[in-house]
């Protein structure tokens, strides 16, 4: 098991996109996308299953999470503080948490994918 944290010059969205592409190319499946938001007196967490979602039509999970996060911001005044990706594979998993601040902090937790996590962290442009 490995826990690693790095700061990057990338935006939260760029970091999430890179993480999604990198870990999926390394054989992990995106299981869940997460948005963690804070209000003045509490918090909200939005979780959306990874991949495609079917409702009135077929939607990408990233689009659904983005829309729900924007609704929580505009309707309720909650502000996103972090975003997350949860990946699974037959041997283990990887969790990626990305802060919504400058510089962006990326926290990586791994079970059985330590080498890939280190390689991904090393590829990020450092803040």
Identify the residue ranges that each predicted region occupies.
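Residue-level detector of functional hotspots within protein domains
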Residues: 1, 9, 14, 71, ...
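Terminal, regulation- and interaction-focused segments at domain boundaries
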Residues: 1-38, 43-46, 51-62
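Hydrophobic, Leu/Ile/Phe/Ala-enriched alpha-helical segments that form helix-helix packing faces
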Residues: 19, 23-27, 68, 72, ...
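Solvent-exposed beta-strand/loop surfaces of large extracellular or lumenal domains
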Residues: 35-36, 41-50, 64-70, 75-78, ...
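Beta-strand/loop substructures that line and gate deep hydrophobic ligand-binding cavities in soluble
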Residues: 55-57, 66, 74-127
